[in-house]
Amino acid sequence: MRMMIRILACLAFVLSGVSAGAQSFYVSPKADQAIAEKLLSELHAIKSGSPDVPTSGLMVEAAMKLMGTPYVAGTLDTDPVNEQLRIYLTKTDCILFVETCLDLALTVKEYKACPDFVQFAWKVASTRYRCDAPWGYGDRIHYTTEWIRRQDKVLKDITLELGGKVYDHPISFMSTHPDSYKQLGNARNIPRAALALQKITETEAELNRTPMTFIPKDKVAGIESRIKTGDIICFVSAIEGLDIAHVAIAYVKGGKVGFIHASQAAGKVIIDPKTIAEYVSSRSNLAGIKVVRPL
């Protein structure tokens, strides 16, 4: 019954968004929309010239065009009360950067004609939320593990194929650290926060039914040669309860297996000077990596 109510609520939200006008379901400054539409046009031109271009190829093209974008943490959480689909291309963090590149590529692949911003926004909604439209903080896909599993039609986790193994590392960070999140704080006294915390706790339990996998940090150098440009690299956390600490896009050039990412240290999107193996081995908070390949 609870699931039916959620489905009906989501459907009502979507229908109300359509009837109220295309812009009602997202928040995005005009400058960000302009960047997105420019990228969609440029990626569409690439696809038109090379119809067989893979999703990974379009992702890397998008990543290169977003080089230098400022790193800003917490861009989705500026309003702890009203959960909205927020889309920014003038600022980003690590997961939003990869999400944006993937969604730009998927949107261009999906449409024959050049897609517009609204079509891109619907794609972002479908990958960021469990229900194709935002209606609560607890409905956002917070854990990268869930994000990967829910995109199984367009992404393939190849961690085990590369020699990875099961990682006994249950996910629980958000439910055990609710005060670290504005939307979950004081859940005992705020019904909205209590509901979000309940949904997140249920999600954690569901995710933990399937074991995590990873390539240990001391094994990464041995499999680097099998990583391809455009693969999504998930840096697995060594912190109790947390699944993924950082996300990037693999970039192989001149035999060097590097990566493109929104770097907090650099304060912007960069091609990191380190290889993937060098990066993961230099950080004590990382246990290893997952490798996810766009289909």
Model region roles, listed by residue range:
Residues 24-99, 106:
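Cationic-aromatic interfacial patches
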Residues 38-48, 57, 112, 214-218, ...:
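Mature, folded catalytic cores of secreted/periplasmic enzymes
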Residues 69-208, 252, 261-264:
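Acidic/His-rich structured neighborhood in mature extracellular/periplasmic domains
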